[in-house]
């Protein structure tokens, strides 16, 4: 696989409001293991959409892995205005999404709901698969994108769920 889209729950969805929460280290350890597998299979591009939570933690892991693996990181934001109203701490995280190998904005500003459909279609057409932290038992707005991914032909979907995190937690405590 050449390009992998990374999406998942936000920190708000997960009830994580502190980066020092043990859940963050479990999630990042799981991300690292999965990303290394993708990279060793030849992954060339990791693509983000600029969301906080799972995506941001995956971005941090990906940037660390760039020291040992040769691959590119890109962020394709839905709008140029994405994150402009975030607090100072989250602005720093937003800046991190912009300090990657490739940055693009799908639209200048929000005008209508159809832009989200076009944006999602663009992401699916320009990546070969996705790594998504999503559990069908804990639905969020991600549900619709995951359904689109699964319906796309020749598109690989790798779901990370709470069971995977439990396995990582147990390994950490062995």
Swiss-Prot record:
SUPFAM superfamilies: MCP/YpsA-like (SSF102405). Disulfide bonds: none annotated. Pfam families: YpsA. InterPro entries: YspA (IPR010697). Belongs to the UPF0398 family. PANTHER family: UPF0398 PROTEIN SPR0331, UPF0398 PROTEIN YPSA. This is UPF0398 protein llmg_0513.
């Amino acid at each position: 696989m050449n390009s992998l889209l990374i999406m998942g729950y936000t920190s708000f969805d997960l009830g994580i409001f502190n980066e020092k929460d043990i859940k963050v280290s479990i999630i990042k350890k799981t991300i690292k293991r999965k990303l290394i597998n993708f990279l060793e299979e030849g992954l060339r591009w990791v693509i983000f959409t600029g969301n906080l939570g799972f995506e941001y933690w995956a971005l941090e892991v990906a940037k660390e892995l760039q020291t040992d693996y040769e691959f590119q990181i890109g962020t394709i934001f839905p709008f140029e205005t994405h994150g402009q109203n975030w607090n100072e701490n989250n602005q720093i995280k937003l800046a991190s999404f912009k300090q990657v190998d490739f940055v693009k904005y799908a639209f200048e500003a929000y005008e209508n709901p159809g832009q989200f459909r076009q944006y999602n279609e663009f992401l699916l057409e320009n990546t070969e698969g996705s790594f998504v932290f999503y559990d069908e038992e804990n639905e969020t707005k991600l549900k619709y994108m995951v359904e689109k991914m699964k319906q796309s032909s020749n598109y690989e979907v790798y779901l990370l769920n709470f069971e995977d995190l439990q396995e990582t937690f147990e390994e950490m405590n062995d």
